[in-house]
């Protein structure tokens, strides 16, 4: 069970009503996830899990790089995730992604009990060298009994129990006094509501000249399918890792 996948060049918009992700993988899957726009997923842009791993169903392996994730997590009824969620022995490399107005940073629940298909992630994973940016909008949905997070920058800097101190140590993380604007060609990070889910096809997530997102460095990532994945006699190759944050560089 499981499968092999190259997930690239897509626009995911408004995934899920009361839960759900843009991309959700489980045990037995080997995937390269790159160059995608993920707008307003209900919970996470990426849920990478090896749930269901067994003697007959192998470990989930994922490379997620150069994706742009916007407004993740705000529409969920209650709080669980809100950006990237890596769990249950998944081996994941998550680098050079651009997170825009998401509710939280990358999470690795149960990280103190790693390498277990019923607990934490594979601790050989690299989840780092990403950029988290925030606008000034306040969410109309706030859970005072949980995090009480109302702004993206609050979520990024919240003391969450699933924030692993070994994750995002080299990432750019917006703060209240330094929100960081990636300078998209046509998307105002201060204007689109955090719970908005209607995707506007005129938006352009290419980066303007001088954007701080144009200079990214990361650990080397070798895509699972850099030499190709054959489907119905046709060979598809995964994109290479690009030296910027997000799905697109300049035009």
Predicted regions: what is each one?
Residues 1-204, 208-220, 224-251:
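Extracellular beta-rich repeat passengers
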């Amino acid at each position: 069970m499981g499968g092999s996948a190259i997930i690239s060049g897509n626009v995911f918009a408004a995934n899920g009503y009361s839960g759900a992700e843009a991309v959700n993988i489980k045990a037995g899957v080997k995937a390269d996830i790159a160059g995608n726009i993920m707008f307003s997923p209900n919970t996470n842009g990426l849920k990478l899990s090896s749930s269901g791993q067994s003697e007959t169903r192998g470990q989930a392996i994922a490379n997620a790089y150069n994706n742009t994730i916007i407004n993740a997590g705000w529409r969920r009824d209650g709080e669980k995730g809100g950006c990237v969620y890596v769990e249950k022995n998944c081996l994941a490399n998550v680098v050079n992604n651009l997170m825009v107005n998401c509710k939280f940073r990358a999470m690795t629940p149960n990280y103190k009990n790693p390498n277990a298909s019923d607990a934490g992630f594979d601790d050989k994973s690299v989840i780092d060298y990403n950029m988290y940016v925030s606008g000034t909008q306040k969410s109309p949905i706030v859970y005072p009994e949980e995090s009480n997070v109302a702004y993206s920058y609050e979520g990024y800097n919240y003391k969450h129990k699933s924030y692993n101190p070994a994750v995002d140590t080299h990432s750019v993380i917006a703060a209240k006094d330094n929100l960081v604007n990636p300078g998209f060609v046509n998307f105002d990070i201060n204007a689109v509501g955090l719970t908005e889910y209607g995707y506007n096809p005129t938006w352009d997530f290419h980066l303007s000249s001088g954007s701080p997102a144009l200079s990214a460095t990361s650990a080397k990532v070798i895509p699972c399918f850099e030499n190709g994945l054959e489907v119905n006699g046709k060979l598809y190759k995964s994109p290479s890792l690009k030296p910027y944050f997000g799905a697109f560089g300049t035009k």
